[in-house]
Design a protein with these regions (language model features):
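Hydrophobic/aromatic-lined pockets within catalytic cores
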Residues: 49, 111, 176-180
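Acidic/polar active-site rim loop that often engages polyanionic ligands
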Residues: 85-88, 149-154
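Short beta-edge/loop segments at beta->alpha junctions of small alpha/beta modules
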Residues: 18-98
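Hydrophobic alpha-helical interaction segments
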Residues: 8, 20, 152-235
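Polybasic, lysine-rich low-complexity intrinsically disordered segments
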Residues: 10-12
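Short gly/ser-rich loop at a beta-strand->alpha-helix junction or flexible surface loop bordering the NTP-binding
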Residues: 69-78, 88-147
Length: 235
């Protein structure tokens, strides 16, 4: 082999490695820009317009663990590559929309109940549904459109935000979706909040009565139980 051929091959090899290094760095940069927000297949494909088969690129990214599939057509970037901590609340909002975090998940988020919650609970105007993902289990319960917007807030966490029930609305939703709970008397309320869910009573008396009143006005599920709860709060 001549010296000229040797150096030409060496240059080509160096070019190949530099090109591959640049491509990987550019790919990581594009994925980092997505951050912790769940994105659809089409959004990921749009990052690689130069490719003839961007859908194959999505499959390869998943296989190489650059992205994590939440369900068909929805992904998050692996935090090892994005450098962003994933938010189960943000994932829940995107996994089945429109929806908001509620019930025990929200009460635990606010520190109102002591027990750990292992399923991410949300409310939706769609049919009730559950999802199992590599990042946890998500459960969605139906709520009427009239009651959906009552007591729901948007919490901003740096560069993203998610919808979550206020403590009052989370309690309404939890009662509404607990089949054995029927608060007819004040003693029922006392037993439920102090013994069943063991809510922080000091924080309970700080709850906003107007949210319960608004829920009752729109005819929310188990409104009669919320009326009794409101009487207990105001006594």
């Amino acid at each position: 082999m001549s010296i000229w051929i040797y150096f030409e091959q060496k240059k080509m090899l160096q070019f190949f490695y530099y090109s591959k290094y640049y491509y990987i760095c550019n790919m990581n940069k594009l994925l980092k820009e997505i951050g912790a927000t769940p994105v659809t297949t089409s959004i990921i494909e749009s990052l690689y317009p130069e490719l003839k088969s961007p859908n194959k690129k999505v499959a390869l990214l998943e296989k190489q663990s650059y992205i994590i599939r939440l369900k068909r057509g929805l992904y998050v970037v692996n935090p090892e590559h994005s450098g962003k901590t994933l938010s189960t609340e943000l994932i829940a909002n995107h996994l089945y929309a429109p929806s908001y975090i509620s019930m025990s998940t929200a009460l635990r988020y606010y520190g109102l109940i002591p027990e750990a919650v292992y399923v991410n609970q949300s409310m939706t105007v769609k049919h009730s549904r559950s999802f199992k993902t590599p990042l946890g289990n998500y459960d969605y319960k139906y709520i009427s459109r009239e009651a959906f917007s009552v007591g729901v807030r948007s919490l901003h966490m740096g560069d993203y935000a998610f919808l979550i029930a206020s403590p009052e609305k989370a309690l309404c939703d939890l009662i509404a979706n607990s089949s054995k709970v029927n608060l007819r008397y004040l003693t029922d309320v006392e037993h439920y909040i102090e013994e069943d869910i063991r809510i922080d009573m000091e924080e309970f008396y700080k709850l906003d009565a107007t949210v319960f009143e608004d829920y009752i006005k729109v005819g929310g599920k188990k409104a009669d139980s919320i009326v009794t709860l409101l009487k207990y709060l105001k006594r």
